[in-house]
């Protein structure tokens, strides 16, 4: 099947590469010539395990192409995926300019039937706006009778596991009201559903809502567990034991029950804000989501609060090792990362920060800038050397079983703040460390 994907960011590139992997002929369009040049030279602008290999393989096979040619891209695919960004505006609403610009380009260049697929996370009712924009462009060209359909097909990709999620989806949500489009979408996704039919067909607005509802629910679980962790510390309970206890209930499940330093990234913060804004537009105050957002912002300060409790408010002359900068493992994404809050707060109190991340260091340098008191270490061991304490912010696998003897010798004092509860407090205490976790007894 011939497919066009508009946008070569996180969503567009992963979607295009995985569709090509299943034998489709995919053209990925982007107006950013620099990004297209990088892709054509074999570069990958984002860190995502498995993506580089799948892109290279399908480019070599001739199934995946990159271009800035709008007219040729629109002509290529019957299916036109829109996978551009929807960044938040100042009021929390999703900025729709890129989605509508893509729709307008399709309307300006299409000459036959197209299925326009909204893959980006978009506000409820976007399909109607996309349809109106395309119809307006067709009418201006005297082609008002040209048939097309608009479909909502939200992505449910986890950064760090996006290729796996795309190739083996747990569900495929399709919102559509056009039978021809439904048949084409089912045919496109049939190779992804050989073991069971995972396609969930619904109306357009329900499909658009499903994406926001899913991310809001996951963000709620994270903030709820972080709230319980704060209480656990006060009452002498261990949130890790509580997590296992409640996660064994099948009505609750084991996922997204980990206390930590708060959520970040490109999706949860943006989508919670957008859903709050949508609710307000329709006269519904989503009070739970307000609390989720507030709790998450507070949680990003929890590690520094613990540092202050140990060292006092004035941290001048102190150096802290920081392990992990990306908002989660297996990505270089620094958007809304808790580490940004931690670094800002430590520097504001006069401390020096020596940070290490196995993947996100370059992106962190770009985001955090060249600031007095901040340096980037070449390894976890280098970051810890001579530091007053270690703060673990992102749970990269290489941090799970470090050389604790070497770490103890490297630090001025054996003091660790475990922001992701990946270490065993009893084991570290036995080894002579002072341990502070999130929601751990004595934490």
Where in the sequence are the language-model features?
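Structural/interface elements that position substrates and couple domains in central-metabolism enzymes
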Residues: 1-443
């Amino acid at each position: 099947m011939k497919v066009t994907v508009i946008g070569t960011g996180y969503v567009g590139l992963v979607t295009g590469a995985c569709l090509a992997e299943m034998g489709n002929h995919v053209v990925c369009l982007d107006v950013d010539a620099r990004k297209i040049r990088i892709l054509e030279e074999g570069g990958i602008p984002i860190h995502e395990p498995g993506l580089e290999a799948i892109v290279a393989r399908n480019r070599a096979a001739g199934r995946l192409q990159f271009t800035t040619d709008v007219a040729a891209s629109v002509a290529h695919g019957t299916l036109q995926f829109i996978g551009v960004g929807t960044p938040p505006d100042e009021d929390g609403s999703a900025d729709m300019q890129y989605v509508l610009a893509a729709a307008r380009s399709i309307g300006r260049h299409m000459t036959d039937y197209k299925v326009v697929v909204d893959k980006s996370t978009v506000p409820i009712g976007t399909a109607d706006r996309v349809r109106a924009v395309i119809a307006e462009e067709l009418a201006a060209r005297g082609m008002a009778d040209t048939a097309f359909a608009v479909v909502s097909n939200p992505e449910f990709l986890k950064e760090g596991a996006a290729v796996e999620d795309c190739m083996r989806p747990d569900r495929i949500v399709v919102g559509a009201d056009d039978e021809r489009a439904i048949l084409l979408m089912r045919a496109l996704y049939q190779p992804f559903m050989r073991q069971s039919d995972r396609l969930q067909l619904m109306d357009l607005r329900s499909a658009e809502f499903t994406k926001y509802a899913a991310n809001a629910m996951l963000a709620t679980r994270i903030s709820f567990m972080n709230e319980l962790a704060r209480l656990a510390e006060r009452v002498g309970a261990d949130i890790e034991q509580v997590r296992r206890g409640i996660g064994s209930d099948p009505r609750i499940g084991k996922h997204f029950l980990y206390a930590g330093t708060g959520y970040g990234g490109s999706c949860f913060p943006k989508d919670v804000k957008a859903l709050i804004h949508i609710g307000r537009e329709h006269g519904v105050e989503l009070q739970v989501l307000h609390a989720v957002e507030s709790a998450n912002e507070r949680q990003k300060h929890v590690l520094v609060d613990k540092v202050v409790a140990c060292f006092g408010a004035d941290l001048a002359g102190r150096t802290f090792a920081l392990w992990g900068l990306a908002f989660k493992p297996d990505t270089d994404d620094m958007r809304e990362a808790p580490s940004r809050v931690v670094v800002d707060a430590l520097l504001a109190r006069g401390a020096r920060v020596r940070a290490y991340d196995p993947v996100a260091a370059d992106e962190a340098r770009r985001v955090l800038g060249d600031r007095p008191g901040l340096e980037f270490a070449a390894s976890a061991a280098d970051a810890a050397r001579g530091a007053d304490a270690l703060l673990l912010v992102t749970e990269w696998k290489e941090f799970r079983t470090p050389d604790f003897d070497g770490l103890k010798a490297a630090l001025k004092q054996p003091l660790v703040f475990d922001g992701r509860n990946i270490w065993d407090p009893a084991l570290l205490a036995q080894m002579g460390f002072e341990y502070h976790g999130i929601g751990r007894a004595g934490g």
